[in-house]
Amino acid sequence: MSFYEIYIPLIAKHNVGKALRAMKETIAEDKLPGYIVARYEDVKNDYRLMQDAMMRGLRDDKIDEVYDDITRKVYGASLDVLIEEKVKKYSSFAYARTSAQQTEAHPDAVRTVLEAYVQDMAMMAFEPENTRKAKMEKLTADHHAYMKQLFNALLVAPMWNDRRAADFADLLLSPTIDRDDALLLVSAVMLAAMNVNDPYKWDMLAEVYVRATDKVLKMRALVGWVLSLPYDPRGPRLFPFVQERIKAMLADKTTLKQMLDMQMQMLFCCNADADNEEIQRNIMPTLIKNTNLQMTRLGIVEKEDDPMKDIMDPNTAERDMEEMERKYRKMMDMQKQGSDIYFGGFSKMKTFPFFYDLCNWFAPFNAAHPALGAARERLAGSTFLNNLMENGPFCDSDKYSFALAIAQIMDRMPDNIKEMLNSDATFGPTVSKDDQEDPAYICRSYLQSLYRFFRLYRSKRDFLNPFILDELEDNDGNALFMSYKLLACPEMEENAVALCGFLLKRKMMREIMSMAICYKSSQNPRLVRFLALVPMTDGKWQEAYDLFASVPEDQHTEESLRGMAHCCMSLKRFGEAVAIYRRLLAMHPDSFSYQLNLAVCLMSSDAFSSCGDAASSCDASSCDASSCDASSCDASSCGASSCDASSCGASSCDASSCGASSCGAASSLGGKVEARPNKVVEEGTKLLYKLDYEHPNNANVRRVLAWCMMLQGHFDKAIDIYTRLLSQPDAVSADRLNAAYAHWLSRDVARAVALLREYCNLCEQEEAEAKEAAKKQGRRCEPTKSRNYRLVEDFTKDADLLSKYGISLTERKIMVDIVLNEEEF
């Protein structure tokens, strides 16, 4: 038996009897501590009393309340069982249990020790100078040893009650204890509540967040209660105060803003590997090349200037400096946007013995930390440690790494470098006092320290990792905490809108889907746009259309209108799409994308219904909406089935997805068929040529024109345009597929085969890059499509066009074999 065999009956069906039977079997099978057995006996006796009362025919008006209270007691006992399972399974919890036995973790006992430490430190000012330093170091070392034991004790502490939670909250908010101690204990409770969802520990963190006036303590408590929220809301719902607390906190706009900032920063942390790769590949080589220092076996020395360099090329130094400044600015811009630019470098510096202790990963940086004793001696007379503590731009974890590393190489440094350690220039751009007090900066710094722990701690798999975007294994969490059902409420909808925009910009479609599922019942028109992305990604255009249509007419936003127009185009309701684009153009008469989309819709109107599958040319029926951009008209995927519309979505219902599958406005117009006079189509044609005249170098317009040429049977003209498109650096894989169709339809089969092979190669390259990016972010990626599958899928989507111009199903099958060079019959 296990924790989950007790837990599931409770949260799924509130079945106390089944949970107690499972717990009885667990006690019989495993040697559990006496306090768990005692708790089980108490709950069992309470439940038997209820049963006995019912057997005697007694009626209790509060029977439901009593049953719920017993349910909560069983839940608490099940959490204690979970702690014991972790102690047996994971070394970190086993060590914590051993260490905890030496420490009394009752709030009153803890308060006595922490307040005594503050008083003793104050009394050090009256000690003689010749003994003060030694006594302070001993006092600090003893206190650190106590805090280490207390941290471990809290990690494996049994489930609290409301009284203990309130006492600890009062203690951590008390001005009579050291702030660093309060910060460390907040982290200890957070780590405990993350791995064993004790609602009372969670409530203590929330209470500290609400009442704290110290910004650093407040933000650490924010991170604590957010990360210890469970993804499954059923457990916490047994405790009404959890929902009440969440509702009260979310009523505060400042809290909402801080949560949104925290969510975005967590996603930046998850992208640390990709950011590090960008820095190592495109920035660091330039910075290293232009440095005048080199490492030798004797230490760091300055390189001699090359006297021939200025003679051969007198402008080299200036160019090198400009290039170095440009790369450096790029790195600083990445940092300002939220990127964790220091992770790559400092991740190699977490092997010091300092990081063997669990609590040190969460310790605020303090130059007086006992583990920095050797560093203080080697840096005696230097202000380096104080500068690092006050102005260093790194998170606390990296500050410790930096201090320990500098101390190791201090003896091998040139004198001028040692002198530089006394200045702020050592750290590059320092952090101003105002920035250090900014809640967003405080939160970012703490999250970066946490990210390093969950990525680099030697026993990291002992703990749930909140920086994972997919639940890949049992000990992984979900970094997208704003998709938790416990937080889904009207107050959070504006945050959800802002976050979805952030995710969309980064093409994080899986995360948008998670948000959409969480807020599927919302009627917020700005949020509906993102909710519709889920069915749009699956090609469920009617479902997406219904979502947009559910928005009252007078509440439509520009974004929801764009999404609705896109659905209309995909559903071939071109008349309705025309009306919506005219409405959008009334808002923005000069909008290029709206004009281009209107032109395609006009050319695809009902007046050309005789064309068969008339111009689904903007049919993004395969749209995965992955890069839906409110203002984009990315016709890069114009054409062919290729239009998997990775470039279109709810907001960019654009001509970008003009595809072959959708034979377009004149799809039935073969080489010898003349278009019938039609004012609507004529308007579309004029508008298209107008856009081409005004934007002669716009690839999107050229793609639409090329597509129209092919649809009308003017294959030579289409080939000419596609040839020019393919010669441009911004050519996309879809251009090759469309060009292949044009050559195939003109019976230049050899060239078509070559282009189709190039198309397959590019698609495989794009899939490999997407898979690598997903791997770095810890996310799952879609299965790779085989060439056979891809071509069959494309040809099937584009069957109407190919059939109209005489390419039969048999020819399509043979073409697939030719492209694949299949010879095994």
State what each model feature region is:
Residues V210, V223-A251, Y741-E767, D800:
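TPR/TPR-like (Sel1-like) alpha-helical repeat modules
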Residues S609-S668:
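Long, intrinsically disordered low-complexity tandem-repeat segments
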Residues M1-F3, T140-K148, I177-V186, D198-P199, ...:
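Generic helix N-cap/helix-start motif at coil->alpha-helix transitions
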Residues E5, A22-E25, R39-D42, K73, ...:
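"A position-specific structural signal for the A-helix of alpha-solenoid helical repeats
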